UniProtKB/Swiss-Prot annotation:
It comes from Pongo pygmaeus. A zinc finger (C2H2-type) spans 344-369. Transcriptional repressor that may play a role in the specification and differentiation of lung epithelium. May also play a role in developing neural, gastrointestinal and cardiovascular tissues. Can act with CTBP1 to synergistically repress transcription but CTPBP1 is not essential. Plays a role in synapse formation by regulating SRPX2 levels. Residues 324-335 have a biased composition (Basic and acidic residues). One of its GO terms (cellular component) is nucleus. The keyword Transport does not apply. Residues 697-713 have a biased composition (Acidic residues). GO terms for biological process: caudate nucleus development; putamen development. This is Forkhead box protein P2. The keyword Nucleus applies. Residues 290-303, 436-457 have a biased composition (Low complexity). Residues 1-44, 279-337, 436-463, 647-666, 676-713 are annotated as: Disordered. InterPro entries: FH_FOXP1_P2 (IPR047412), Fork_head_dom (IPR001766), FOXP (IPR050998), FOXP-CC (IPR032354), TF_fork_head_CS_2 (IPR030456), WH-like_DNA-bd_sf (IPR036388), WH_DNA-bd_sf (IPR036390). Forms homodimers and heterodimers with FOXP1 and FOXP4. Dimerization is required for DNA-binding. Interacts with CTBP1. Interacts with FOXP1. Interacts with TBR1. Interacts with ZMYM2.
């Protein structure tokens, strides 16, 4: 039992490996061998001790096995005596290194090892454990270092590979560039004539442009020759008289004769814009009615390529317009005969390049506007613009036809006149008017007017039978145009607010309207100014002039009353005085037509055309009183109704804007037949417009015309 307990204790205990060599060599002396093992532990290293322990354990195990085989027949006593010495030592060398407290107590009770030996074993065991920990840490550090080295090597290899790839890519790109350059060189060598072909194409384009220019110049020369021939033919017929200082008349009054409507539309589209019916009227009747229907729509386009105008006389009060057109057209036709060149600027759409002379313009035209895609596209755009303008012109012509139909006036057909007549239109001004009213309005390019064709033969006077029931006619037109101003402004509020168009009313009417629109029917001067600028875009400029006109009207008109109140000085309207002043203008005695303003509105232009129709239709018959019949009398009556209506609603200050409705302030002016003493020897008998006004009406006219002149200055 003692041997078995010692064997189990040793097998479960841990002994120091440094002292195992002495125990295995001396099995019989346990205590002495333990001491000697403590002495040798300091001399032998840990690694050597481990090897020795393993070898000794193996040897002890072998010896134990051999002894068990040889002593199997011996008595149990002898085997019991030997086992305590051999088995525990061999088993102890193979046991783990940790000794539990229970195992320690068993060893102490059995007295196999002394306490000193056990302490020495424990110390050795701790030293061995520390050494093992140090070895493990050392191994870990070495492994980490090796791992880091491996990672660094891998990174270096990757970087090297990337650098190699980049170098390869650069080399490939260089090779591709070299190949492309080589291909380009080869292509240039294979096709040396491409540049020459391009140069030839450019030269061909320049030649085509030069040919087109020559063709256009030839067309212009042909046009000039045809115009001169037409002028000579008219002069021979006695229809016109050209003084020595005058070379030509405006193209608007002398359309081309001998050309078909298609040729006129193609060659003179920007010059005349006149209907073929009107051309026939010129050739047969000897009267100029061309601009009656076209002035309102084509007045802004006729100044582009008109022939030279060298005379300085006033025609229809349009001296300023004719001077401006003469300057622009003479520059185009004389020094530089090209439609696309004027005032030193290229008129190609969107170009406007400055050219000092005509030669530089030709170079610019051949270089910049050659036959290419851009120029072709610009030509197409210009064609579309022309088409749109033609469509608009046709619409306006249809509108004019409908208006004339509504006014019970069919278009007049031209009739041949054996004796040309001298008709001075109601739109023209007499010499006395030019002398007495230096502040007459200059004619603007967009203002439609009726032209005059001077004719030197044949007296003609309107007979009394042609103008019946003048009083009834006057009353009807007075009622027709006696409409409030608010009904005119209300539907056209946005138009007057945004368009730079002067309203067709006098300053007095506008001031009254401003005051009547206010809540308490009274306004200060600044509030009146604000109403003018807020309601009409026309009064947002030239404030100094029209404000002076407003103050002038406020101070001179009796219908405006100045009242002092809490707000200060305010202005009110005396409706009784205003209506009294209005009735004085409406109910005037029938007088001769005189002093008709030169600037007419759209309705006045229409009535001017009706007057021309009157002259063409009725006056040839009036030259022979026996040919007058009831039809001609009715026609004259209708014409005079429209004439008196147009004269009644003209603005008393002589100003009216195109496209505006009739005006509430009117002068009662009527046509009266009366032979007038001729002022020129060449005109023995003619229709000259004169007028008589009462002193009160003259005062009102002076009041309204003076601020208007200030406005235009």
């Amino acid at each position: 039992m003692m041997q078995e307990s010692v064997t189990e204790t040793i097998s479960n205990s841990s002994m120091n490996q440094n002292g195992m060599s002495t125990l295995s060599s001396q099995l019989d002396a346990g205590s002495r061998d333990g001491r000697s093992s403590g002495d040798t532990s300091s001399e032998v290293s840990t690694v050597e001790l481990l090897h020795l322990q393993q070898q000794q354990a193996l040897q002890a195990a072998r010896q134990l096995l051999l002894q068990q085989q040889t002593s199997g027949l011996k008595s149990p006593k002898s085997s019991d005596k030997q086992r305590p010495l051999q088995v525990p030592v061999s088993v102890a060398m193979m046991t783990p290194q940790v000794i539990t407290p229970q195992q320690m107590q068993q060893i102490l009770q059995q007295q196999v090892l002394s306490p000193q030996q056990l302490q020495a074993l424990l110390q050795q065991q701790q030293a061995v454990m520390l050494q093992q920990q140090q070895l493990q840490e050392f191994y870990k550090k070495q492994q980490e270092q090796l791992h880091l080295q491996l990672l660094q090597q891998q990174q270096q290899q990757q970087q090297q590979q990337q650098q190699q790839q980049q170098q390869q890519q650069q080399q490939q790109q260089q090779q591709q560039q070299q190949q492309q350059q080589q291909q380009q060189q080869q292509q240039q060598q294979q096709h040396p004539g491409k540049q020459a072909k391009e140069q030839q194409q450019q030269q061909q384009q320049q030649q085509l442009a030069a040919q087109q220019l020559v063709f256009q110049q030839q067309l212009l020369q042909m046009q000039q020759l045809q115009q001169q021939q037409h002028l000579l033919s008219l002069q021979r017929q006695g229809l016109i008289s050209i003084p020595p200082g005058q070379a030509a008349l405006p193209v608007q009054s002398l359309p081309q004769a001998g050309l078909s409507p298609a040729e006129i539309q193609q060659l003179w589209k920007e010059v005349t814009g006149v209907h073929s019916m009107e051309d026939n009227g010129i050739k047969h009747g000897g009267l100029d009615l061309t601009t009656n229907n076209s002035s309102s729509t084509t007045s802004s386009t006729t100044s582009k390529a008109s022939p030279p105008i060298t005379h300085h006389s006033i025609v229809n009060g349009q001296s300023s317009v004719l001077n401006a057109r003469r300057d622009s057209s003479s520059h185009e036709e004389t020094g530089a005969s090209h439609t696309l060149y004027g005032h030193g600027v290229c008129k190609w759409p969107g170009c406007e390049s400055i050219c000092e002379d005509f030669g530089q313009f030709l170079k610019h035209l051949n270089n910049e506007h050659a036959l290419d895609d851009r120029s072709t596209a610009q030509c197409r755009v210009q064609m579309q613009v022309v088409q749109q303008l033609e469509i608009q012109l046709s619409k306006e012509r249809e509108r004019l036809q409908a208006m004339m139909t509504h006014l019970h006036m069919r278009p007049s057909e031209p009739k041949p006149s054996p004796k040309p007549l001298n008709l001075v239109s109601s739109v023209t001004m007499s010499k006395n008017m030019l002398e007495t009213s230096p502040q007459s309005l200059p004619q603007t390019p967009t203002t439609p007017t009726a032209p005059v064709t001077p004719i030197t033969q044949g007296p003609s006077v309107i007979t009394p039978a042609s103008v019946p029931n003048v009083g009834a006619i006057r009353r009807r037109h007075s009622d027709k145009y006696n409409i409030p101003m608010s009904s005119e402004i209300a539907p056209n509020y946005e138009f007057y607010k945004n368009a730079d168009v002067r309203p067709p009313f006098t300053y007095a009417t506008l001031i009254r309207q401003a005051i009547m629109e206010s809540s308490d029917r009274q306004l200060t001067l600044n509030e009146i100014y604000s109403w003018f600028t807020r309601t009409f875009a026309y009064f947002r400029r030239n404030a100094a002039t029209w404000k002076n006109a407003v103050r002038h009207n406020l101070s001179l008109h009796k219908c405006f009353v100045r009242v002092e109140n809490v707000k200060g000085a305010v202005w009110t309207v005396d409706e009784v005085e205003y209506q009294k002043r209005r009735s004085q203008k409406i109910t005037g005695s029938p007088t001769l037509v005189k002093n008709i303003p030169t600037s007419l509105g759209y309705g006045a232009a229409l009535n001017a055309s009706l007057q021309a129709a009157l002259a063409e239709s009725s006056l040839p018959l009036l030259s022979n009183p026996g040919l007058i019949n009831n039809a001609s009398s009715g026609l004259l009556q209708a014409v005079h109704e429209d004439l008196n209506g147009s004269l009644d609603h003209i603005d008393s200050n002589g100003n009216s804007s195109p496209g505006c409705s009739p005006q509430p302030h009117i002068h009662s002016i009527h046509v009266k037949e009366e032979p007038v003493i001729a002022e020129d020897e060449d005109c023995p008998m003619s229709l000259v417009t004169t007028a008589n006004h009462s002193p009160e009406l003259e005062d009102d006219r002076e009041i309204e015309e003076e601020p208007l002149s200030e406005d235009l200055e």
